[in-house]
Amino acid sequence: MSFFLTTPTAIDLGVNIDHVATLRNVRGTTYPDPIRAALAAEEAGADAITLHLREDRRHIVDADVRKLRPLLKTRMNLECAVTTEMLDIACEVRPHDACLVPEKREELTTEGGLDVAGHFEAVRAACKQLADVGVRVSLFIDPDETQIRAAHEAGAPVIELHTGRYAEAHDEAEQQREYERIVAGVQAGAQLGLKVNAGHGLHYTNVQQIAAIDGIVELNIGHAIVAHAIFAGWDNAVREMKAIMVAARVAALHGGAR
């Protein structure tokens, strides 16, 4: 729920500010300022601010994280890899949420979910390290029952289901299969008592079906909002995404969704 709203919304929006920083860094300037973008997003209805501190610092940098943390009125959702350096930074900054993600230096963006089952002990240790300093842990995983169960066993109270394959599907049949995987993943997570979020690759014309899924608490969206802001303005881009999500969820609750 946004700090600026007086009643809970049907579904929360976490606005990812990474690509505001990308635009800044590509020319080595001090603008556009991701801190300003984050605070404006809160005022426009964002329920959380998401940012990914990558090991290569290709967009968000350490100073962004440290400067933003005390300024937020909603929540900071800090995405980071399961490495000693990143976990130590997260424990120092103490965001409200830390979402552990896989990371490859050569990738353009995160390409898949964290393999919790395959790196179970490392992930479990990371969950404990963060929880011990009061940080709520989320694991960014594929909508796969094995990974969801491993996330629960590792001690994570939150999962974020990777929607990239749904978003990048080549045809309707493939997209429907991925949608059904996400629905099953949401149900599996809910049965284990996990808070279920979702994100990756969602934009203004594909988010509706995902936002309509009962049980998804929050969607994290960034690139599409930054891109739309070029034409609509930042505040409008955030408000429009939030409105689309809420409308889809309300319609689903009243029997209007597929």
Swiss-Prot record:
Its EC number is 2.6.99.2. Keywords: Cytoplasm, Pyridoxine biosynthesis, Transferase. Gene3D superfamilies: Aldolase class I (3.20.20.70). GO terms for biological process: pyridoxine biosynthetic process. It catalyses: 3-amino-2-oxopropyl phosphate + 1-deoxy-D-xylulose 5-phosphate = pyridoxine 5'-phosphate + phosphate + 2 H2O + H(+). The record marks 160 as: Transition state stabilizer. Coiled coil: none annotated. GO terms for cellular component: cytosol. Pathway: Cofactor biosynthesis; pyridoxine 5'-phosphate biosynthesis; pyridoxine 5'-phosphate from D-erythrose 4-phosphate: step 5/5. 1-deoxy-D-xylulose 5-phosphate binds at residues 18-19, 54, 59, 109. It is found in: Cytoplasm. Its main location: cytoplasm. 3-amino-2-oxopropyl phosphate binds at residues 16, 27, 201, 222-223. The active site is at 52 (proton acceptor), 79 (proton acceptor), 200 (proton donor). Catalyzes the complicated ring closure reaction between the two acyclic compounds 1-deoxy-D-xylulose-5-phosphate (DXP) and 3-amino-2-oxopropyl phosphate (1-amino-acetone-3-phosphate or AAP) to form pyridoxine 5'-phosphate (PNP) and inorganic phosphate. Belongs to the PNP synthase family. This is Pyridoxine 5'-phosphate synthase. The lineage of its organism: Bacteria, Pseudomonadati, Pseudomonadota, Betaproteobacteria, Burkholderiales. The gene is pdxJ.
